[in-house]
């Protein structure tokens, strides 16, 4: 059929109609559709869409895959998440990338002329052969270690796309190409630079470690234990009397957290227990042995101690209970740790040790166990209830009407327990045995502790974490997967929470504790940073050392270019400058800080009553999160790395954020947000959907002279001075050849606030540089890039979430802030209603006393209560103290009128509040913040201008 068409451009259209009946199916199955989808992405990856201007769409949706590198991202994640090295040949026929394989097995994804070669072929051998051979040579040169080719290859995953002339395959499925390399029609040489990057990606280090395993195993054998009657020379170890004997199978080795825990455990043991129970105190956390070098493992004192205590031999398998009884000094390991997240981590590290080194022991039912001890107790009269995790307690508190009447005792660690309580623990013996669940147990333990499985941990935390999910402490057997998913996950989540902030307030835990303490102390007058950090530790239960706290306080107060757009604390003293990126701050003993006046405009005091405060050992500490009136997470920018996650967000202009929220509230369109750095004189330019170019500033002042007036954000003045010195001296390449100097001389008039370098080039050199690609910006390194694609943050449910862009983050923030206004309004209505009721009752009470309608003299408390009740006075907090405790001088006619005026004013304010919408409340506070920010910004600009006009000494380099 010949049909006329409107288009003048030639094209080919291929359609097919599957004969479902012929294939015995009713339609396309999900697997078939998945295959089509996979092939669709394959086509996108191997077709040069930019050059040929070909567009791809599947079911009407355009593909986001534009090149082979983006296709690789679908396998291993974005470049920011997973390291890889990419290279393409000059002829355009070859492009390839290498990453570290997730398991110890070589993997390849390859294409020949657009055909997916699942099984590989000569083209794969051709490229991987070069990579492995050159890596062997590189490692031998750098490390003086001869590495087997298989040791390198098994670490790699290769992505390869190539064009071969007349390729031949071993079957009609074309999944293996067997054309010899001399008939490829082109050649590909893997560059030395590519090899160096692959080696530094971690391949060289791992290959060296694996190569040395054989030799080091000999050393490991020297630390082996054996089943002996006694073990000597192990510090702080208390051996069971029957260990190493014919009855060793009934002996239990307790691994506890520290010496204080050991003392408590000893006090709880009976004489019979001492025969079968041994105790070894761990010094903090065990080494994560997964992926570690054998040398590091054999040099670890705790691990070598455990080998001797248990009689463990390196490389030996203990498959059955009988093997344990015959070869080991103990028949069971019991872990006793604090009931907090760090205790869970120690349990996990113990499991990981045996799973890595003696995996068969993790499969023997009950060989590894732990004892549950209370994290808190609730007492009322003679009744005592024990709770073994926060989830149990919170569920009980919610379900118990009189929970507030119970006395709560927290057991922060095992050291909190008394001797009689330890005796109780061993009498009750709430021992939980770990159970092996086939391959799922192996996978989940490896996933949590394998450094190479960061992406899997990321998925695990996002999909599995729930703040109210805890182990059922009534169980006597728990699978490894259940332990990891319901207990250990809280440690990983908390580890992230210390490094990655909440999207609502943009604060990490330490910063939130600092802000909480500043608000609690009403820090409106200056205090030494060292003193304030002590106050924070005491009042917010900060447990990670005051050194890191001092650093966090200093960072919150810094206000140089590239630090904070809004510093929540004031820097009264030397808190660091852009000269050295804040590293030049003075000691915390000599500098002072206080709340910035703008801080309460961002975090209104009226919110404090409706925040959800956390509880630490019975002490009210910081809230779960603050709810600032603009998304503060975007004000100062964020950088953080946690378990499997990282977060990187540039800062934005507070004025733009105020306008964004205002427009959302009033139904107006919102403008695109562009990263902003307070005081930065350069430019920020969008170059991709999620990528920005940051440029410094220079001015040409003569034929061979420029003045650099701004550096890209994050490049500090002294760092750049060193760079200029190197450019003036000339550089030396890796072969020792020295190149000519790029600049002739430079002069620095830089201050701690402003950049001012005068750079002189050799005669005629500047014109040459300006004419070259990238020009002065590139040569002088006056540009850098930032991305907005790595936004992982905690949401309102305390779950980690990936935000595709900042607008999506603002959407989530907006709903949480709106709900906070709703809670605040209801709380204020209740507070004002109660105040009006109290004032009404007080006015009426004074009036009744004045007219002798009530006479409380010589009356019992019971009679007084009955009299007030009969006159319809309201009880407040269950009694009438607010009335009967009123001073006698308040019982006057004037006070009646005063109380009624206060009541009427309160009722008027209440009515105004009821008529005020949530939007109006928010807009009013945005207006106030905008005015406050205007003053704040002017003050910063004035400070910068004042420094700029000061006379500075001249520094010349020649």
What are these regions (language model features)?
Residues 1-958:
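Conserved phosphate-chemistry cores used by DNA topoisomerases
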